[in-house]
Each structure stands twice: as structure tokens, then as C-alpha cells.
Amino acid sequence: STPIKSSAASDVYKRQGYVDTKNYSYADFANEVNIHTGGISSTIGVYPSVKDKDDYQVKFEVRTKALYDKLPEAATLMKEMLFTSNIDDEKRLYEIIAELKSRLQVSISSAGHSVASTRAMTYFSKAAAYKDTITFYETLCDLEAHFDERKEALTAKLKEMVSSIFTKEHLLVSVTCEKDGLSIVETELEKFIPMLYETSGEEKQAEIVPVRKNEGFMDASQVLYVARAGNFRAHGFDYHGALRILKVIMEYDYLWINIRVKGGAYGCMNGYMKNGDTYFVSYRDPNLEKTNEIYDGIPAYIEQFTADERDMTKYIIGTISDMDVPMNPSTKGDRSMACLLYTSPSPRDTR
């Protein structure tokens, strides 16, 4: 898990398992992964600080799952993917961009609530701006339409990222296993670390400046995803665990009754993050103006809210049930890594 610069190239590079490597075609590589592991994947994780609303960390993450006796094969395949992927294959690179664009187009239509809420938060949140699906989609459209003009610059950027991401200084390893597996992991890490690059010179963190906009996006659909967002820390309020209960109250009372039952939307959501980012969003909603009026009524609803002990107990139980869920080893590892990165300062604060 390593820091990266802000670039659409990083999202394209997540598909590195989809290109030929030194020893395998991308189809053969996929077969080897399936034979020896439970999968190898890469993603970009964005971790807002719980202490500073303007601070965040971005990590390029490579993950795998494997049985103990298959850990050497898993490590070998990860090294094959990270250090020998052929990113000079322009034909394959174009195919990946076109595939990404097509899949993202479907995702935008099917998960409009997530797209809308994130986009609304980009107006004030740097972390949300990193995750903005619409900007990435627009970039992919541009890359596909002007691939011949951009391919050399894109390939150069991908190569630059390989040497700046996979460095010894940036390496952070999270392992979830029993003690028997830890010694095997340590042995494989001793082979892996010498292959990493040395950090060269002073690194520059890409600066994101949120811009407040007034916009809407049209889709080939008869329904809407209506979002409102803001940051309560920017207005002098701190995060409190009671906000988790408020989320349940809103979704099962005020928003549910007004947007789902009376308004006819398929769903409604809200969220309160520890960095202060907050959103309200409707799902497959036939209304725009009415839903916005309902959002306007939220402060008055909270000010006048009353509930007896029985109802509050139900809300609290509902809150805990969302938090206290069984976790498999993979989920436990994700949780522990997130807890570390959400609370630790970003690299630019430690330099």
C-alpha cells in the first residue's frame, strides 16, 4: 500500500493484471492467479483524516488471498504483475480504457446515488474529489477519443508511477493470518523488498482545490438521484457517536416516510463521516423539487424530534446491528488497515 499522485493514470494502472507480463499472456496470468490464489487485485484507497477535515491519504493497494502452502506462488505472481507488466502494448491499453469507460457508464446509471453524493461532496472535500466518478469518466472519454494523441504521454505517466509508487520508503504491509502463516509472509517479504525502487528526490503531493458548482447530469433514465452535501466540522461541530443513531432515525423515519413512502422513491440514504463530510441522497426518485424541500425541512425535524424509550431503543439496536457484524479474515484486515490510515497523519504532515 503506497501513496500516489493524483492522476487518471493511476485508475488505469489498477488494470495491470489485464496486460501481458514477462512470463505470461494476460489470459494465462489470470489462470495462474485462479489456480494458486483466491485472487489478486489492485485498487486505490482514499482515507480522510478523522482529525483534520482537509487532510487525507491516498494509497495504491495490491491485495491477495492464499492458503499458507500457496503463499510463495501468490508472492511470485504479485511480483510478476507489479514489476513486469507490459504497459507498452498500445492496443491492449486502448482496449482497457474502452472497457473501463463502458463499465463505468453502466455503474453511473445503476449506482447514481453514490455518484451524486460523492460529486456533491467534491465541492468542498478533497478526499471526495479523489473519488469522483464523473471526472474519471470524462477523462476516460477523452483518452479513448484522442488515444493516438495521448498514448505516449499516458504510457510515460504509467512508467513514472511504477517507479514512484513501488518504493521501499512507501511500503506498508497488512497481513491477516495465524502465527503459522506469518513466518512464510516474512520470508517472501525478504525477497520482495529488494525489488522495490529507491525514492528519488522530493516528492510533490498533488494539490486539489475543491470548486463549488451548480450542476446536474442527465442520464437515459426516468428517475433521479437527488443529493445534498456539506461538512459539519466547517461549521464548528465535532463528530459524535450519536450521529450514527441520527443516520438510522433519518433513514427509517423522516427520509423514509417523506421520500420513500410519500414521494415514491425507491430509497433514501444519509451519512455523517468523522472528517465532517455529510450527505443526503435519494435513490430512483421521481421528484426533484419536492425532495429538495424535504431536505430543507431536516433542521426543523431534528429540532422538534421526540421519541419514547421504546423507539429510541429500536434506533440504538438498529445502529449497533450495522456496526456489530461478523467479519471474515479479509474484512478484519481491511478494518485494521483503515483504522490505522484514518488516524495517522498524511506523509506531507510528517515530512
Outline where the language-model segments fall:
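M16/MPP (pitrilysin/insulinase) zinc-metallopeptidase core fold and M16-derived inactive scaffolds
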Residues: K14-A74, I249-L255, K262, G271-Y272
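Single conserved hydrophobic/aromatic residue that forms the stacking wall/gate
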Residues: T2-A9, Y13, Y342-T350
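Generic recognition of flexible, low-complexity loop/linker segments
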Residues: A156-S164, H170-L172, N214-G216, L255-W256, ...
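An aromatic/glycine/proline-enriched structural segment found at the starts
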Residues: L172-F232
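Scaffold signal of the M16-like zinc-metallopeptidase fold and its non-catalytic homologs
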Residues: L104-K168, M323-S344, R348-R351
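A glycine-rich, aromatic-flanked flexible loop/lid motif
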Residues: V46-K53, N214-R228, R260-D277, R284-Y295, ...
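M16/insulysin-pitrilysin zinc metalloprotease superfamily fold
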Residues: Y18-Y24, D54-S107, E190-Y197, N270-M327
